[in-house]
């Protein structure tokens, strides 16, 4: 089926932006799997998220940009469990669970992979397939971060942290309030590597208390 000229132009515009992106170019040079690596590096530099020996869950992990950073930071005595609906090439020090995180079976596989360990940091970079229609995309995005928070509540150690990509829009304020009910402190971050036109921000919740 032929695509419309508008779709073709939009795709061409996205590709040009992607290949011109300095973080994309840096990721090739530095050996990182995606430009998203720089978001986590910046957040870690500011908030000291990752330390040797930590147990970390990475949701929405493919192609592995965050897991790559996390595995390096937590070291051999740490543990990184990553999950995504998409395939992800193996990474040393990372246990990967492939599947749809909205399905109970995938959640159970993540819990099994933990082998009884409590988690120090749950990270979610999940996002739905965007249609460009806020009325559809925003509820789907909020549903994913709600599920991520549910997992964090099940697995975090007391005092643990939760980092999630959230899109500003309907449901954002209510979600922020919900986070504040389970954590001592919640801050909003917008990494430099996050595209300026994007509605995405990262909420960092610290001091989990249930």
Swiss-Prot record:
Catalytic reaction annotation: uridine(2552) in 23S rRNA + S-adenosyl-L-methionine = 2'-O-methyluridine(2552) in 23S rRNA + S-adenosyl-L-homocysteine + H(+)
**Which EC numbers does the record give?**
2.1.1.166
- Could you tell me the superkingdom of the organism this chain comes from? Bacteria
* Keyword annotations of the record: Cytoplasm, Methyltransferase, rRNA processing, S-adenosyl-L-methionine, Transferase
Q: Which GO terms describe its cellular component?
A: cytoplasm
* Broad class of the protein's primary localization: cytoplasm
Does the record's keyword annotation contain S-adenosyl-L-methionine? yes
Summarize where S-adenosyl-L-methionine binds, as residue positions: 64, 66, 84, 100, 125
Gene Ontology molecular function: rRNA (uridine-2'-O-)-methyltransferase activity
Which Pfam family, any one, appears in the UniProt record?
A: FtsJ
State the SUPFAM superfamilies in the record: S-adenosyl-L-methionine-dependent methyltransferases
Q: Where is the active site?
A: 165
Location(s), subcellular = Cytoplasm
NCBIfam families, per the entry? PRK11188.1
> What's the family?
Belongs to the class I-like SAM-binding methyltransferase superfamily. RNA methyltransferase RlmE family.
Q: What does this protein do?
A: Specifically methylates the uridine in position 2552 of 23S rRNA at the 2'-O position of the ribose in the fully assembled 50S ribosomal subunit.
Listed name of the protein: Ribosomal RNA large subunit methyltransferase E
Organism of origin is Chromohalobacter salexigens (strain ATCC BAA-138 / DSM 3043 / CIP 106854 / NCIMB 13768 / 1H11)
What's the gene?
rlmE
């Amino acid at each position: 089926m032929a695509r419309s000229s508008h779709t073709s132009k939009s795709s061409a515009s996205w590709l040009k932006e992607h290949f011109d992106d300095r973080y994309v170019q840096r990721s090739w040079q530095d050996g990182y799997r995606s430009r998203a690596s720089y978001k986590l590096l910046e957040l870690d530099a500011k908030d000291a998220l990752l330390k040797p020996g930590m147990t970390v869950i990475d949701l929405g992990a493919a192609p592995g940009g965050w897991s790559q950073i996390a595995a390096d930071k937590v070291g051999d005595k740490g543990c990184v469990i990553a999950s995504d609906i998409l395939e992800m090439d193996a990474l040393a020090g990372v246990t990967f669970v492939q599947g749809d995180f909205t399905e109970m079976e995938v959640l159970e596989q993540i819990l099994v992979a933990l082998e009884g360990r409590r988690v120090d940091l749950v990270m979610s970079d999940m996002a739905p397939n965007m249609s460009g229609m806020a009325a559809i995309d925003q509820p789907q995005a909020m549903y994913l971060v709600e599920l991520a928070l549910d997992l964090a509540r099940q697995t975090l150690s007391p005092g643990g942290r939760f980092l999630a990509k959230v899109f500003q829009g309907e449901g954002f304020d209510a979600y922020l309030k919900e986070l504040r009910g389970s954590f001592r402190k919640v801050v909003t971050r917008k990494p430099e590597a996050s595209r300026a036109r994007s509605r995405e921000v990262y909420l960092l919740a610290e001091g989990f208390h249930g």
